[in-house]
């Protein structure tokens, strides 16, 4: 775990240096540390960023702590760097995938429960309401379509409205995969 945390920080820090990204002179945590907290939360704390912040602070990985609201604002400012990091890691995974076999699957991202749909401010269209057969429930939100290698390493993703089927969502999406690549998916 220790080496993974240090590796994540080094990747984030090198990416920001490569992009000539500058931190504010008054900030107590660098943007690389903000990105590291978010990634460590996803890797080890099931997305719980408060627990990851507390853990990294107690273990001495980060020197200063900031409030939850300040952390969320800072995290929103580096969202484009996360996409760049994901794309770079995806390109590396594609280069190492000698089999050229990829798996495509989708999973729902529920914005709210069914009884709160009328009050939802993010999405107001019926295209976002769909049925999730595996859990036997309706959801309201988006679907994330992931392209992964045989080992499960994500290389690409795209979002679509929840009611859009997987096959219909593939039409406008242009894969950035090698020409001889095989894409395997289910019929859902």
What spans do the regions from the language model cover?
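Short alpha-helical elements
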Residues: 1-188
């Amino acid at each position: 775990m220790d080496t993974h945390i240090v590796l994540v920080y080094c990747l984030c820090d090198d990416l920001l240096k490569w992009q000539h990204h500058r931190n504010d002179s008054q900030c107590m945590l660098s943007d690389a540390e903000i990105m590291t907290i978010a990634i460590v939360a996803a890797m080890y704390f099931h997305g719980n960023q408060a627990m990851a912040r507390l853990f990294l602070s107690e273990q001495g990985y980060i020197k200063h702590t900031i409030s939850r609201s300040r952390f969320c604002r800072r995290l929103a400012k580096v969202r484009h760097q996360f996409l760049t990091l994901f794309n770079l890691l995806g390109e590396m995974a594609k280069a190492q995938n000698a089999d050229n076999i990829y798996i495509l699957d989708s999973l729902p991202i529920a914005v709210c429960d069914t009884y709160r749909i009328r009050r939802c401010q993010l999405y107001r269209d019926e295209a976002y309401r769909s049925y999730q057969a595996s859990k036997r429930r309706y959801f309201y939100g988006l679907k994330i379509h992931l392209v992964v290698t045989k080992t499960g390493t994500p290389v690409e993703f795209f979002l679509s409205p929840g009611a859009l089927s997987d096959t219909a969502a593939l039409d406008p999406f242009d894969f950035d995969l090698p020409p001889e690549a095989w894409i395997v998916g289910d019929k859902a």
